[in-house]
């Protein structure tokens, strides 16, 4: 067996480069962090051939003398820390002292630097980590680093680089993350001699609109919270801006871009049912915590972070985001954002982190509160006594006449499904004889149209009722509210083996919800009582459908048990498309919808309400 020997520095640096320099974007990230730590107020990034031919970063920071310039390319040489204790109180982005050594080892590396009071600058050139040229050079104050022919001496690594489009996208995303984190810095980016952007002002809105589209900044919700433990500032997106990928989530810890699974999960849970399955919101959030409470020395890439008190960080992060999001009006406008995925962007720190430096501006809110929209509805409809919202069971009775529509959402509906109709219908719209000007109509037995002060409000009757039933089910299970009605004739249901296993898992919560159930043998369930929302005659179908949907939600969404059950219950018991509603039914549904905590989306993230303003109608008809 060969003797153990210490590796030469050049070999060790090549190995280290595999962790630090994974692709051209890694080079860009490390050079930008050095420029920011040097106190630069203007940074230029120039790229050629997606970083394979050239990565150049020029800054007007503090610069270096010749001794420091030579030392900065050595392995584990840094000005950021001097002893191990300082790792517990880092206020800089860089600190490991290995990036430039790793980069210079796998490229043709050039460094030009000058301090402001020096008459001439220093120029150093390295090939494969070896100093090949050293001398004086005319240069502006600051530092310019040029990395050419990346991985020229590591052909295996160069071979596994992706296409130019993919590599450039990673570079652009890395630059974008820093541009958004430091609005006080002027940023310029050049790709293959073409200027992509040149931000000279600190206007955050200008940058957001450039990267994500016109008027993007105006669609955001501002987050601003400080306490003795942490601060959280920035912006989060409305649910209409959600998308499948998480590449538009920017979370910073003391202005260091980070990736943290715990914070990502807390963010998803804070939005909850506002998000469609497997979608994520846009966020640009700056988390400030005492550096002694964090550990960023987890991986050479410095993206991962650990918190000393992870539970407190998660709880506060979740609470602040939820509070900021939940009181907003998310009813989309026709011709506006709608509920869709946002398009891809352009590329298809403790004491330093004050509000003034971040340059945050108040986002002009385009959303009214829930109470404002409900008030518009009330003012635009005839006066009537307000319903007693404590008499939930009586209100729910209005919808108990729905037929077996729960089990067959796509079936055709007949008037006979709903019994004898006594009210007058005109073009499919039901009118009460005592109401000459109802201001509420039902369209195709599917949507409710309401006149409001500023235009029209359209409501999907199924998902509206789903939202009402969902919140009611959660409240019943959490607070043990009596909700059962006994059956005159108990029903027997034969379950499949897998259905019976799920039944055993959720039977206690089914009991809290209002199901009075018993078992016979190994697969038979006796239904002796059901919740008040369940229509007579559909008890067995409802139970089986709830079990099936619960299983689907559990496998796809990984929900909490009670949340899963509440979603299954509300979906299977809500009135469906095709069911005619009386005027009083519609009014009651609207009243109860606006009494919920989140009336604008159903428990699965779909929109409940859409508004059409008079201004939009005027534009459609050419009046404006």
From Swiss-Prot:
<dbReference type="InterPro" id="IPR014762">
    <property type="entry name" value="DNA_mismatch_repair_CS"/>
</dbReference>
<feature type="region of interest" description="Disordered">
    <location>
        <begin position="336"/>
        <end position="357"/>
    </location>
</feature>
<dbReference type="InterPro" id="IPR037198">
    <property type="entry name" value="MutL_C_sf"/>
</dbReference>
<dbReference type="GO" id="GO:0006298">
    <property type="term" value="P:mismatch repair"/>
</dbReference>
<dbReference type="InterPro" id="IPR002099">
    <property type="entry name" value="MutL/Mlh/PMS"/>
</dbReference>
<dbReference type="InterPro" id="IPR014790">
    <property type="entry name" value="MutL_C"/>
</dbReference>
<comment type="function">
    <text>This protein is involved in the repair of mismatches in DNA. It is required for dam-dependent methyl-directed DNA mismatch repair. May act as a 'molecular matchmaker', a protein that promotes the formation of a stable complex between two or more DNA-binding proteins in an ATP-dependent manner without itself being part of a final effector complex.</text>
</comment>
<feature type="compositionally biased region" description="Low complexity">
    <location>
        <begin position="344"/>
        <end position="353"/>
    </location>
</feature>
<dbReference type="GO" id="GO:0032300">
    <property type="term" value="C:mismatch repair complex"/>
</dbReference>
<keyword id="KW-0234">DNA repair</keyword>
<dbReference type="GO" id="GO:0140664">
    <property type="term" value="F:ATP-dependent DNA damage sensor activity"/>
</dbReference>
<dbReference type="InterPro" id="IPR020667">
    <property type="entry name" value="DNA_mismatch_repair_MutL"/>
</dbReference>
<comment type="similarity">
    <text>Belongs to the DNA mismatch repair MutL/HexB family.</text>
</comment>
<protein>
    <recommendedName>
        <fullName>DNA mismatch repair protein MutL</fullName>
    </recommendedName>
</protein>
<dbReference type="InterPro" id="IPR036890">
    <property type="entry name" value="HATPase_C_sf"/>
</dbReference>
<dbReference type="InterPro" id="IPR038973">
    <property type="entry name" value="MutL/Mlh/Pms-like"/>
</dbReference>
<dbReference type="InterPro" id="IPR042121">
    <property type="entry name" value="MutL_C_regsub"/>
</dbReference>
<dbReference type="Pfam" id="PF13589">
    <property type="entry name" value="HATPase_c_3"/>
</dbReference>
<keyword id="KW-0227">DNA damage</keyword>
<dbReference type="GO" id="GO:0005524">
    <property type="term" value="F:ATP binding"/>
</dbReference>
<dbReference type="InterPro" id="IPR013507">
    <property type="entry name" value="DNA_mismatch_S5_2-like"/>
</dbReference>
<dbReference type="GO" id="GO:0030983">
    <property type="term" value="F:mismatched DNA binding"/>
</dbReference>
<dbReference type="InterPro" id="IPR042120">
    <property type="entry name" value="MutL_C_dimsub"/>
</dbReference>
<dbReference type="InterPro" id="IPR014721">
    <property type="entry name" value="Ribsml_uS5_D2-typ_fold_subgr"/>
</dbReference>
<dbReference type="GO" id="GO:0016887">
    <property type="term" value="F:ATP hydrolysis activity"/>
</dbReference>
<dbReference type="Pfam" id="PF01119">
    <property type="entry name" value="DNA_mis_repair"/>
</dbReference>
<dbReference type="Pfam" id="PF08676">
    <property type="entry name" value="MutL_C"/>
</dbReference>
<dbReference type="InterPro" id="IPR020568">
    <property type="entry name" value="Ribosomal_Su5_D2-typ_SF"/>
</dbReference>
């Amino acid at each position: 067996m060969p003797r153990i020997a210490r590796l030469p520095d050049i070999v060790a640096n090549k190995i280290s480069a595999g962790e630090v320099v994974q692709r051209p974007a890694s080079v860009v990230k490390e050079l930008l962090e050095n420029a920011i730590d040097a106190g630069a107020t203007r940074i230029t990034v120039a790229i050629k051939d997606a970083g394979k031919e050239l990565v150049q970063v020029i800054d007007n920071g503090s610069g270096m003398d010749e001794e420091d310039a030579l030392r900065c390319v050595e392995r584990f040489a840094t000005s950021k820390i001097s002893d191990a204790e300082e790792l517990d109180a880092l206020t800089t982005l860089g600190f490991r002292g290995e990036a430039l050594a790793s980069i210079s080892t796998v490229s043709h590396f050039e460094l030009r630097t000058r301090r402001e009071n020096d008459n001439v600058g220093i120029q150093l050139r390295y090939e494969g980590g070896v100093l090949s040229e050293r001398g004086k050079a005319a240069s502006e104050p600051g530092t310019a680093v040029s990395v050419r022919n990346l991985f020229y001496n590591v052909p295996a690594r160069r071979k596994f680089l992706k296409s130019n489009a993919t590599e450039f996208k990673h570079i652009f995303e890395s630059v974008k993350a820093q541009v958004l984190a430091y609005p006080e810095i002027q940023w310029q980016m050049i790709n293959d001699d073409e200027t992509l952007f040149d931000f000279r002002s600190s206007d955050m809105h200008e940058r957001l609109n450039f990267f994500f589209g016109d008027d993007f900044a105006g669609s955001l919700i501002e987050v601003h919270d400080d306490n003795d433990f942490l601060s959280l500032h920035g912006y989060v997106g409305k649910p209409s801006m959600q998308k499948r990928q998480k590449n538009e989530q920017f979370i910073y810890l003391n202005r260091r871009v980070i990736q943290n699974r715990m914070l990502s999960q807390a963010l998803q849970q804070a939005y909850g049912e506002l998000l469609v399955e497997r979608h994520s919101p846009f966020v640009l959030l700056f988390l400030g915590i005492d550096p002694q409470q964090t550990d960023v020395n987890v991986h050479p890439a410095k993206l991962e972070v650990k918190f000393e008190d992870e539970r407190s960080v998660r709880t506060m992060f979740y609470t602040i985001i939820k509070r900021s999001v939940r009181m907003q009006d998310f009813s989309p406008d026709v011709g506006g954002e709608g509920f869709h995925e946002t398009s891809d962007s352009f590329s298809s720190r403790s004491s330093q982190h004050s509000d003034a430096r971040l340059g945050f501006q108040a986002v002009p809110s385009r959303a009214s509160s829930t109470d404002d929209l409900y008030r518009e509805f009330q003012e635009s409809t005839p006066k009537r006594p307000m319903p007693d919202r404590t008499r939930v069971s009586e209100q729910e009775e209005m919808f108990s006449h729905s037929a077996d529509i729960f089990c067959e959402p796509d079936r055709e509906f007949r008037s006979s499904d709903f019994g004898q109709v006594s009210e007058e219908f005109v073009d499919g719209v039901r009118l009460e004889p005592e109401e000459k000007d109802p201001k509420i109509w039902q369209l195709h037995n599917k949507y409710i149209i309401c006149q409001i002060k500023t235009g029209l409000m359209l409501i999907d009757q199924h998902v509206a009722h789903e939202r009402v039933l969902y919140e009611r089910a959660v409240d019943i299970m959490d607070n043990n509210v009596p909700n059962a009605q006994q059956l005159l004739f108990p029903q027997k249901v034969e379950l499949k083996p897998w259905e019976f296993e799920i039944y055993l898992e959720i039977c206690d919560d089914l009991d809290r919800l209002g199901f009075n159930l018993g078992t016979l043998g190994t697969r038979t369930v006796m239904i002796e009582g059901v919740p008040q929302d369940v229509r007579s005659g559909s008890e067995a179908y409802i139970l089986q459908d709830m079990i099936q949907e619960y299983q689907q939600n559990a496998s796809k969404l990984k929900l909490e048990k009670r949340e899963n059950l509440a979603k299954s219950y509300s979906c299977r018991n809500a009135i469906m498309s095709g069911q005619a509603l009386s005027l009083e039914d519609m009014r009651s549904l609207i009243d109860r919808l606006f009494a919920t905590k989140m009336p604008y989306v159903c428990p699965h993230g779909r929109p409940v309400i859409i508004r059409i303003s008079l201004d939009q109608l005027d534009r459609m008809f050419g009046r404006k």
